């Protein structure tokens, strides 16, 4: 995979870890903005975008852009303590940067790009470890409105059905749930414990980017821990017509 890195200061030094990777690192200067760097990276056929640290509002905007259109996925670091805090912080950054004006719209865009949150902690002994792996599950908006008022004969019945639709509308407008989250992996008493399975959509996306060896190991992991058994897609075979199939069309004329 080709790595495309955007940083405010060079500190990742990934070429020491991945010397054989195609890596392009860029940082903003006084004359070249970070947005210009990101626009250039979109045209360089990158597979993974890495944002060094989302510490300012403009950098949060870069992260959202790169996660939506520029690569297979985006990695970034943030200092939020909980997953809801992460969503709120990124949403507020998008609003302050002027990218969005509405809180719900900004939050909806944020949760669409947050697939997994790998939360690291450092205890008082100086030990650093992964505390949890959390999956973000966007909640799709469903059309729950009905036309039952047409079936009502009386005005009171029609008004009651109308108020039901109005209640649904105001609930979606004022208190709509945009996402759910659940821990996939947790660190408990010195051991890592699998708590919830990965959603079907993310499993499918992950399998589509694996080679045969990784796919076998991943499928075995799913079946062993969560009882999820998946069948690999069969190779496409073009069907050949069976022998003796009658041809459509007019019958040939008989000659005497």
Residue ranges and their predicted role:
Residues 12, 32, 60, 116, ...:
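A generic structural micro-environment signature
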Residues 1-111:
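Switch/coupling sub-region of P-loop NTPases
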Residues 11-16, 103-107, 116-121, 162-174, ...:
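Intrinsically disordered, low-complexity boundary segments flanking structured domains
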Residues 36-39, 45, 57, 85, ...:
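Acidic-enriched, low-complexity/disordered segments with a strong bias for Aspartate over Glutamate
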């Amino acid at each position: 995979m080709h790595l495309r890195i955007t940083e405010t200061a060079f500190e990742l030094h990934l070429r020491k870890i991945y010397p054989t990777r195609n890596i392009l690192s860029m940082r903003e200067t006084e004359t070249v903005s970070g947005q210009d760097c990101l626009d250039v990276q979109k045209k360089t056929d990158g597979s993974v975008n890495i944002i060094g640290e989302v510490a300012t509002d403009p950098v949060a905007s870069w992260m959202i852009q790169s996660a939506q259109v520029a690569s297979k996925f985006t990695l970034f670091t943030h200092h939020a303590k909980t997953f809801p805090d992460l969503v709120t912080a990124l949403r507020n950054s998008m609003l302050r940067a002027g990218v969005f004006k509405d809180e719900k719209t900004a939050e909806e865009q944020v949760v669409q790009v947050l697939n997994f949150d790998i939360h690291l902690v450092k205890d008082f002994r100086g030990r650093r470890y992964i505390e949890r792996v959390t999956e973000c599950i966007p909640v799709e908006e469903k059309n729950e409105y009905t036309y039952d008022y047409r079936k009502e004969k009386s005005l009171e019945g029609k008004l009651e059905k109308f108020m039901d639709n109005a209640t649904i509308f105001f609930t979606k407008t004022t208190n709509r749930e945009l996402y759910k989250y659940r821990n996939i992996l947790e660190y408990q008493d010195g051991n890592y414990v699998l708590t919830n399975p990965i959603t079907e959509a993310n499993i499918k996306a992950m399998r589509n980017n694996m080679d045969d060896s990784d796919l076998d190991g991943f499928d075995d992991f799913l079946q062993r821990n969560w009882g999820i058994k998946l069948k690999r897609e069969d190779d496409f075979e073009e069907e050949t017509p069976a022998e003796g199939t009658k041809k459509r069309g007019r019958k040939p004329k008989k000659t005497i």
